[in-house]
């Protein structure tokens, strides 16, 4: 995997070992950032189910002001930390918690994000635990990018679908406040 654009363009990034992490492909990542490009420069980014951190790292490379990576897997957390160090990116914080706990902490602290990137496991079908916090951490004019299996059409009450696109076995749905 590599950073596609921005100040760290072409630099490789490390994915955690094992089968528990499914990194977003370069093609999907490039298309996502084409969609959200106007929101990235100077943005506060929240990368949920961060895995390797590829999405948040891409945002930082493209000019995001800050990124918070939420990931529960210890090997993935180490990969994110190594990638941040290797790329020399600043303005990042890694939160080692399950996503619901991490979201609760961010929401409880009153933190708002311009761009929220969520890539839950494709086997996940119940998003109700996320619904409690997602709308609350999204800035008024912010976007939520939600990656799922192509057959899933997520519906997040309190948020409106801006666009939804399929890329092979992946669906990317972009939400905003109505």
Question: Residue spans of the language-model regions?
Answer:
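Class I S-adenosyl-L-methionine-dependent methyltransferase catalytic core
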Residues: 1-178
């Amino acid at each position: 995997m590599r950073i596609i654009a921005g100040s760290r363009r072409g630099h490789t990034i490390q994915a955690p070992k094992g089968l528990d992490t499914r990194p977003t492909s370069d093609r999907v990542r490039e298309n996502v950032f084409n969609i959200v490009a106007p929101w990235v420069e100077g943005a506060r980014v929240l990368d949920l189910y961060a895995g390797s951190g590829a999405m948040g790292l891409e945002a930082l490379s493209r000019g995001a002001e800050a990124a918070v990576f939420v990931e529960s897997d210890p090997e993935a957390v180490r990969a994110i930390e190594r990638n941040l160090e290797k790329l020399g990116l600043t303005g990042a914080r890694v939160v080692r918690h399950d996503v619901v706990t991490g979201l609760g902490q961010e929401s409880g602290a009153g933190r708002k994000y311009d761009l929220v990137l969520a890539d839950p496991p494709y086997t996940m079908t119940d998003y109700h635990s996320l619904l409690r916090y997602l709308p609350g951490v999204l800035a008024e004019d912010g976007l939520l990018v939600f990656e799922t299996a192509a057959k899933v059409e997520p519906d997040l009450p309190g948020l409106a679908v801006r666009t939804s696109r399929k890329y092979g076995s992946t669906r990317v749905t972009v939400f905003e406040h109505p």
